[in-house]
């Protein structure tokens, strides 16, 4: 009998020792309205961001406690490669979505600005007479491309107009065989009226 009494009397004592003195009974468990699990497990769900929004809106005090308690864990999980690390990436996907879209718009706008800068080249045509061997000369025409004039078309036009050889020798340069500096300006302005007097210069005789 003594043994039974001791066992029975010892059982409540053991239960009291194992109980949390600060706990209040019965305990109330808060279940998330999104995933239907206890709030402590929201961070392990596929969409923890929605769970946090619901918790912050309906139970801000509980949300604050959970945020403070899990902040260090979230930092360590973000660098992990396991399932928890994947959860950390899931939590970070929603906020940066708008930022990534904004960056794409900025990049597209930046490329547009570069194209505009390419069109700031001054529109200028220069004519020059260059000496060749045996007192011969060639006429050099530069700058037609700044007026969006096709150089191949201009080269054929000059060759036909002056009945001589003409060739495109550089990115924006045409060489005409012969000295036509007295007539070339009038010919150019007649063919391409957009090249006015202020946009064309006669450099005279120059060395190549």
Swiss-Prot record:
Biased composition (Polar residues): 1-12
UniProt keywords, alphabetically: Initiation factor, Phosphoprotein, Protein biosynthesis
Stretches with biased composition (Gly residues): 77-89
GO MF term list: translation initiation factor activity
InterPro entries for this protein: DENR/SUI1_TIF, DENR_C, DENR_eukaryotes, DENR_N, SUI1, SUI1_dom_sf
Domain SUI1: 125-192
Biased composition (Basic residues): 105-120
GO biological process: formation of translation preinitiation complex; translation reinitiation
Recorded superkingdom: Eukaryota
Region called Disordered, residue ranges: 1-20, 69-120
One Pfam family of this chain: DENR_N
Record PTM Phosphoserine, positions in chain: 9
Job description of the protein: May be involved in the translation of target mRNAs by scanning and recognition of the initiation codon. Involved in translation initiation; promotes recruitment of aminoacetyled initiator tRNA to P site of 40S ribosomes. Can promote release of deacylated tRNA and mRNA from recycled 40S subunits following ABCE1-mediated dissociation of post-termination ribosomal complexes into subunits.
Protein name, UniProt field: Density-regulated protein
Organism of provenance: Danio rerio
